[in-house]
């Protein structure tokens, strides 16, 4: 776990960029329409740590030693796209809270929340048009949006089919979480005129960061001691089987596997959650997931070190480590 001092040091190289981003993000979430103003204000106060905009800025600095006006704009676009996707996810999942705050669909209704998500998405499009981003940057944003939709549809389909394969799990992760991390890294590189080879390396780096982030997020669902803005076992209740339990399913004896599947194929009650959390710990699912995070972390660090040495590279290395060690 990183100390508070190390976390503070990580903030220093990006402080000015993030301050500018936060001001731009706040301005973008404003409307004269009364029906929207309260909802947009709520989004401002319930936004997260802005991890994806940080990646945009760091990858720009990694490739060119500086950021540009397009870098800031790209960071705003990616965060607006991320925000819109979360609003729609909450509707799909019937979620009442996110990060400990009520969701828009809880405050209003599913119908209104969908339209509010569309408004935020349209705001991202307006930012793209107004800044005249390059065709390649437009393509990256559009592809990220498509991958988000594909990933969500895949997850819903797999949940209904009760399919439990690790390769399917990673396919969903790379399209949902990984899509925006990959796009963030690519946009950062493209915003400063990086070479095609640099853009590709940044994209792969972003994908690996997305995987590490999601696996760590999955572990939170199995830890009753963590306070991450959602109850323990929340994903299981929604029919989402993540890596800790997938590992157990794919290594269990036939009778035990059938028993686990029987729990997953019926409405999940408190006793069922306790059983599934316990079996994931006792059968090595938690340990396996932690090892996978370590492998992904090392691959990301090795890739990062293919870039020229710089203070930004050192910052990104600490940032990647923090993603795999964060507490929420």
Where are the regions a protein language model picked out?
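All-alpha prenyltransferase/terpene-synthase fold signal
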Residues: 1-328
């Amino acid at each position: 776990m990183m100390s508070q001092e190390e976390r503070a040091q990580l903030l220093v190289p990006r402080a000015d960029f993030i301050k500018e981003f936060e001001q731009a993000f706040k301005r973008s979430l404003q409307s004269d329409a009364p029906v929207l103003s309260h909802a947009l204000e709520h989004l401002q106060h319930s936004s997260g740590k802005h991890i994806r905009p940080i990646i945009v800025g760091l990858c720009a600095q990694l490739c060119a030693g500086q950021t540009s006006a397009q870098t800031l704009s790209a960071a705003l676009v990616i965060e607006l796209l991320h925000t819109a996707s979360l609003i729609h996810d909450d509707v799909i999942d019937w979620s009442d809270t996110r990060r400990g705050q009520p969701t828009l669909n809880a405050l209003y209704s599913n119908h209104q929340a969908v339209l509010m998500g569309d408004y935020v998405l349209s705001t991202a499009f307006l930012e793209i048009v107004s800044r005249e981003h390059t065709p390649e940057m437009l393509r990256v944003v559009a592809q990220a949006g498509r991958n988000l939709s594909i990933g969500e549809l895949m997850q819903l389909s797999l949940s209904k089919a009760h399919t439990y394969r690790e390769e399917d799990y990673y396919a969903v992760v790379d399209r949902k979480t990984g899509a925006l991390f990959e796009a963030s890294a690519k946009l950062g590189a493209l915003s400063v005129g990086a070479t095609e080879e640099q853009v590709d390396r940044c994209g792969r780096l972003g994908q690996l960061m997305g995987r590490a982030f999601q696996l760590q997020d999955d572990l939170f669902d199995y830890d009753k001691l963590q306070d991450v803005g959602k109850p323990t076992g929340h994903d299981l209740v929604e029919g989402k089987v993540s890596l800790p339990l997938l590992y157990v399913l794919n290594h269990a004896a036939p009778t035990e596997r059938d028993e686990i599947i029987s729990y997953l194929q019926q409405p999940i009650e408190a006793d069922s959650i306790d059983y599934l959390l316990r079996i994931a710990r006792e059968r090595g699912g938690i340990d396996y997931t932690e090892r996978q995070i370590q492998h992904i972390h090392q691959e990301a660090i090795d890739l990062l070190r293919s870039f020229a040495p710089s203070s930004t590279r050192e910052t990104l290395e600490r940032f990647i480590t923090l993603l795999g060690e964060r507490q929420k």
